[in-house]
UniProtKB/Swiss-Prot annotation:
Record function comment: Co-chaperone involved in the maturation of iron-sulfur cluster-containing proteins. Seems to help targeting proteins to be folded toward HscA.
Protein name: Co-chaperone protein HscB homolog
InterPro entries: DnaJ_domain, HscB, HscB_C_sf, HscB_oligo_C, J_dom_sf
Entries under NCBIfam families matching the protein: hscB, PRK00294.1
UniProt keyword terms in alphabetical order: Chaperone
A GO cellular component entry from the record: iron-sulfur cluster transfer complex
J domain boundaries: 5-77
Highest taxon of source: Bacteria
Subunit text: Interacts with HscA and stimulates its ATPase activity.
GO aspect biological process, one term: protein complex oligomerization
Bilayer-spanning residue ranges: none
SMART domains xrefs: DnaJ
One example GO MF annotation: protein-folding chaperone binding
Length: 173
């Protein structure tokens, strides 16, 4: 038995634009139905299947609630795999990456928690801009190469945002 499509699991049509509140509600509903504790008195095979269904549901939810993971998944459904560690080939974006990394390093050296918060806010705006761009481009099947380029950028910003969170935690301690 193969893994069902993440969107089908939630009775959604594959699309980038999702109602995240509706997704979360449906996830909670499905999680209650497939939770392994409900199968504690069942046979070993049923328990194993419940664990598998629960794991599949969790993976699907994590994928769909993240814009970059959702975009990457949509492309994969169409046969356009974007590796997780895909590099961005766009010179302008590479320069932007260098600028962000230098700024993050300065914030770290200065232990500037307020500066980190402002930096994080700018990253969030950049992420939202990429999400909006992907949503527009996704509607045009002829622009899948552009969509792949945006996913690479989205993945970079996700990684950088994680680094910012780690810096915040270190500075907060």
């Amino acid at each position: 038995m193969g893994t069902p499509c993440h969107f089908a699991l939630f009775d959604l049509k594959p699309d980038f634009e999702l109602d995240l509140a509706q997704l979360a509600d449906r996830y909670r509903e499905l999680a209650r139905q497939v939770h392994p504790d409900r199968f504690a008195d069942a046979g070993e095979s049923e328990q194993r299947q419940a664990l598998e269904r629960s794991a599949n549901l969790n993976e699907a939810y994590q994928t769909l609630k993240s814009p970059s993971r959702r975009a990457r998944y949509l492309l994969a459904l169409e046969g356009h795999d974007v590796p997780l560690e895909a590099t961005v080939q766009d010179p302008a974006f590479l320069m932007q990456q260098m600028h962000w990394r230098e700024e993050l390093e300065e914030l770290h050296e200065q232990a500037d928690l307020d500066g980190v918060a402002a930096f994080k806010s700018r990253l969030k705006q950049a992420q939202q801009g990429l999400n909006d761009d992907f949503g527009q481009i996704w509607r045009d099947p002829a622009r899948r190469v552009d969509a792949e380029r945006l996913v690479r950028r989205m993945q970079f910003l996700d990684k950088l945002t994680q680094e910012v969170r780690q810096l915040e935690e270190r500075l907060d301690d």
